[in-house]
């Protein structure tokens, strides 16, 4: 079964000093979750907007549209998501690709640190699913894949951290208009 990726709109007001995101823990799988989870071994975790407690927010991915946030919000959100570096807890969602991309390999789950990068793509790129159709990192050859941790994930985070400095200097609006690639020259790319 292929999960349809649908953006939904949440009206979210951020108070200064509060986090944009939270991590929910799922210890028990309800019947509506069965097709979403990567295996039968909870706990699972999900990065969500702090103000979203809906079941729908757990099922659709990503749970928001970038059009609702200012460039200043997007900059703060990216900074916060980069703090998930090293978080290898298993994401609630199993690996699922969007568009025409299909993945039939053995990997079924990904870590919160990979999810954080994937969410960054969804708030930065207008068509994030063309840039990163599924939460799998690969080397330039496409032969080696990473979804949890390791050298490729570390390289990806280093590239995103450098990219973040670059896009802040450019201005988030200008960088988004130019669709500046976070992984350019890193030796890592998103699986397509």
Regions found by a protein language model. Give the residues of each.
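Bacterial Sec-dependent N-terminal signal peptides
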Residues: 1-25
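Extended repeat-based scaffolds of very large eukaryotic assembly and lipid-transport proteins
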Residues: 16-192
């Amino acid at each position: 079964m292929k999960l349809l990726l649908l953006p939904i709109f949440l009206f979210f007001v951020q108070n200064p000093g509060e986090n944009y995101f939270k991590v929910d823990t799922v210890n028990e799988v309800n019947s509506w979750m069965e097709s979403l989870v990567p295996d039968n071994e909870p706990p699972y975790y999900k990065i969500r907007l702090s103000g979203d407690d809906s079941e729908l927010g757990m099922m659709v991915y990503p749970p928001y549209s970038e059009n609702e946030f200012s460039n200043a919000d997007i900059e703060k959100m990216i900074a916060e998501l980069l703090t998930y570096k090293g978080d290898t807890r298993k994401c609630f969602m199993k690996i699922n690709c969007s568009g025409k991309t299909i993945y039939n390999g053995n990997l079924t789950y990904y870590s919160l640190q990979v999810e954080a990068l994937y969410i960054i793509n969804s708030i930065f790129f207008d068509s994030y699913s063309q840039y990163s159709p599924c939460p799998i990192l690969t080397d330039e050859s496409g032969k080696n894949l990473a979804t949890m941790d390791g050298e490729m994930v570390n390289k990806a985070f280093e590239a995103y951290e450098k990219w973040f400095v670059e896009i802040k200097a450019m201005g988030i609006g200008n960088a988004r208009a130019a669709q500046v690639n976070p992984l350019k020259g890193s030796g890592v790319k998103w699986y397509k």
